Each structure stands twice: as structure tokens, then as C-alpha cells.
Design a protein with these regions (language model features):
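P-loop/Walker-type NTP enzyme "switch/lid" segment
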Residues: 64-147, 246-256
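C-terminal lobe/tail of nucleotide-utilizing enzymes
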Residues: 1-21, 202-204, 208-305
Length: 305
């Protein structure tokens, strides 16, 4: 049975359909969310995948790009096997439509190219040598992908990810995943310290694999006090995800958590996070998307050079 909350959220989504419709590159852009971390092994990819599915279950048109700088395996985590990936798009041997997979709950999944992601046009000005270069063509395809979705999620795993640290600003929201481990918290602080200043990006902290809301709140407050004191930065708390054995089981079985164990504590927490992101993120329908904005910045810089 569909809950009253889900019905209400679907109504909210209908109001936000102006975010992005049509196939041209001039329409309203998708809400862009990068899920990142200061270190590996904190569950970033699993969270990005299941967050996309949670949005899909709310009838949100969601696309997930595996932009991990490591070995991208988002497709394998949801039982797919994409032979073609972003690396082939960047090389010009495949179109973005060719490599995009139909994922669970109506989401679209773009398999990653690993370290090749660092060559995406918005991160590599050399990709813009000529108007007909692979960089120009790739970014036009990415802009079209944005225009055809309401929410664009990026698994931005990997320290210093260019989507997160671009000096011109990146996605609308950056969700920084951390765990209670001291090394994870230290890496989260280092990530915040390295973020570009004065950009219109909302930074949110998500505490993963934690035993309770109280513990998550304590960890967040500790991190917040440090960033306030030394960085004059105040990230908000996105929420917390409990330590749940179902997460590892789902990964081993190559089935997303929200499909295999939708009523598990971690799955419910991710669904609630998706709901909050929709409620709490007003969008300017005239604002350009992340790819369109950074593409324009880089091309203008080249024209002025």
C-alpha cells in the first residue's frame, strides 16, 4: 500500500517537474547531488545508488552517474553489467545514450570510467581544444541528460573529486559521507577544508554505520564545532544511516538494498533522506545545471584566452 507520505511527496514532485523536461539543452536543469567522502570504504556508492532508487520510487526522474575515481561498480551493485561506460563516451567511441542503463525503479545508470572520470570536460580544459572536440560533444550529451531528469546524482567517491572541488562550484548539493571512525571524521574535516569557498553549493553531512540518532548528532556537533572554529564553515546534517547487516548482504547479492530489504533500518533511513532532500531544496527553474554552468564557464574562459 502506498503511504500518505509517498502520495504527498509525489504531489510535491509534480510541482517540481519544471526542473527539467524535454531534450534541448536550454530548459530548466535537474537538481544535482554529489555523494562523496574523504576516504574510501564508508559506503558512498551504496548510498548514492539507493538514494537514486528511493527517488525513483517517488516517481522522480533520477539519473545516477558513476563518477567514482576508483573502479566504478554501480552497475554491478544493481545486477547490471554495462560493458560500455563513460570511458568510451570520453573517447568518442560510444554515445552517452549507448552506455546508459535502465536501472531499478525507473532510474537511469551511467557506468563509470574510473580514473578516466577526471578527464570529463568540466575538469579538463584541454578537452575544449576545438568546438568539434570530444569534450564539447561529451558535455552536450551530459547537458541533455540533465534536461531529461528531475534529479542528477553523482557517485563522486574519491578524495579531491573534481565534481566537488571545481573552483567554479559544482553540484547544488554535496553530501559528505562519514562514519564514527576517527580516521573517517578526520578525512571529512580535511575534505571540508579543501572545498572552494564562496560557491553556491549546499554542503551536508551524512553519518553512516552509526548506532543511534544521538550518536550521529554528537559526531555531527563535534565536526560542526571544529569547522566553525577553524574554517568558518557550517555544513548541515543530512541525517544518519544505522549500521545494518542487510547492506552488506545486498551488496554481495548484487541487489540494491531498497529492492532486497526495503523495510530494513538502513533502507528506511535512505528513503527518509530522499524525502527530506525534495522537501528542503527549493529550485530556481531558470538556474543552469551543473554541466551546463561549468561548460559555459570553461568555454568562455577559452574564448577570452
Amino acid at each position: 500500500m502506498v503511504s500518505d507520505q509517498a502520495r504527498h511527496l509525489r504531489g510535491l514532485v509534480e510541482q517540481h517537474q519544471q526542473w527539467g523536461t524535454g531534450s534541448d539543452t536550454s530548459g530548466a536543469a535537474a537538481l544535482s547531488i554529489a555523494v562523496t567522502s574523504g576516504k574510501g570504504g564508508v559506503g558512498t556508492s551504496s548510498i548514492a545508488l539507493n538514494l537514486a532508487i528511493a527517488l525513483g520510487q517517488l516517481n522522480v526522474r533520477a539519473a545516477l552517474i558513476d563518477a567514482s575515481l576508483g573502479l566504478g561498480h554501480i552497475d554491478l551493485m544493481c545486477g547490471l553489467n554495462g560493458y560500455w561506460n563513460l570511458e568510451h563516451v570520453l573517447a568518442g567511441s560510444r554515445r552517452l545514450d549507448d552506455v546508459t542503463l535502465d536501472g531499478p525503479s525507473g532510474i537511469h545508470v551511467v557506468p563509470g570510467g574510473g580514473a578516466m572520470t577526471a578527464r570529463l570536460p568540466i575538469t579538463d580544459s584541454d578537452a575544449f581544444d576545438t568546438p568539434r572536440s570530444p569534450g564539447h560533444d561529451t558535455v552536450r550529451q551530459l547537458v541533455a541528460l540533465e534536461a531529461n531528469h528531475d534529479v542528477l546524482l553523482l557517485d563522486a567517491s574519491g578524495a579531491g573529486h573534481p565534481f566537488v572541488f571545481h573552483p567554479g562550484g559544482g553540484t547544488n548539493i554535496v553530501i559528505l559521507v562519514t562514519t564514527p571512525e576517527p580516521t573517517s571524521l578526520a578525512d571529512a574535516y580535511a575534505t571540508i577544508k579543501s572545498l572552494p569557498r564562496h560557491v553556491d553549493t549546499r554542503l551536508m553531512i551524512l553519518v553512516n554505520r552509526v548506532e543511534s540518532a544521538r550518536k550521529a548528532g554528537e559526531l555531527y556537533q563535534r565536526l560542526l564545532q571544529t569547522t566553525r572554529l577553524f574554517l568558518e564553515s557550517e555544513p548541515t546534517l543530512a541525517g544518519w544511516i544505522p549500521d545494518d547487516p542487510e547492506v552488506g548482504q545486498a551488496i554481495r547479492q548484487r541487489t540494491p538494498l531498497l529492492i532486497q530489504a526495503e523495510n530494513s533500518p538502513a533502507a528506511r533511513a535512505i528513503s527518509q533522506l530522499a524525502s527530506r532532500l525534495l522537501y528542503q531544496t527549493p529550485r530556481d527553474p531558470e538556474a543552469p545545471g551543473v554541466f551546463q554552468r561549468l561548460y559555459l564557464q570553461d568555454t568562455r574562459a577559452q574564448e577570452a584566452a
